[in-house]
């Protein structure tokens, strides 16, 4: 009987998926204030294409601050491909401020792995995706203040 229970426990635990933490290093802060950085995560290309409607807000724990960057830990991210977007919430409103019909961001934003000085378009999935496994995964987000053509 004990062997049956051991086999059942083995089967249950062998299918368990272990989530990993993502360490996010955010840099290029033009505004030297202590306003929070807000994160959103996306786990597929289909989700990424939907832009703001596809991404899900996620909390990041601030673990290090210096003059050049801030480091955050996002806990328990499911293994697989994903992308992050971030914005510096300058007015602490809890939402990305946009202007006009085109919805141009009024606060600095960035995406995982995207290293540009100016955002001209929504980045492609292959430009921003990264792999998460059960170990800690590190990714850079460079904030950008300039948008458009």
Task: Tell me the role of every PLM-derived stretch.
Residues 22-29:
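A short, amphipathic beta-strand motif
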Residues 80-86:
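A short tyrosine-centered beta-strand micro-motif
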């Amino acid at each position: 009987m004990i062997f049956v229970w051991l086999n059942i426990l083995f089967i249950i635990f062998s299918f368990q998926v272990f989530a990993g933490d993502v360490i996010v290093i955010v840099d290029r802060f033009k505004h030297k204030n202590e306003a929070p950085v807000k994160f959103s995560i996306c786990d597929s290309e289909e989700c990424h294409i939907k832009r703001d409607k596809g991404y899900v807000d996620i909390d990041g724990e601030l673990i290090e601050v210096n003059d050049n960057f801030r480091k955050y830990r996002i806990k328990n991210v499911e293994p697989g491909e994903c992308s992050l977007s971030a914005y510096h919430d300058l007015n602490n409103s809890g939402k990305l401020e946009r202007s006009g019909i085109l919805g141009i961001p009024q606060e600095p934003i960035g995406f995982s792995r995207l290293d540009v000085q100016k955002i001209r378009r929504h980045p492609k999935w292959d430009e921003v995706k990264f792999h998460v496994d059960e170990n800690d995964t590190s990714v850079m987000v460079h904030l950008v203040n300039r948008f458009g053509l």
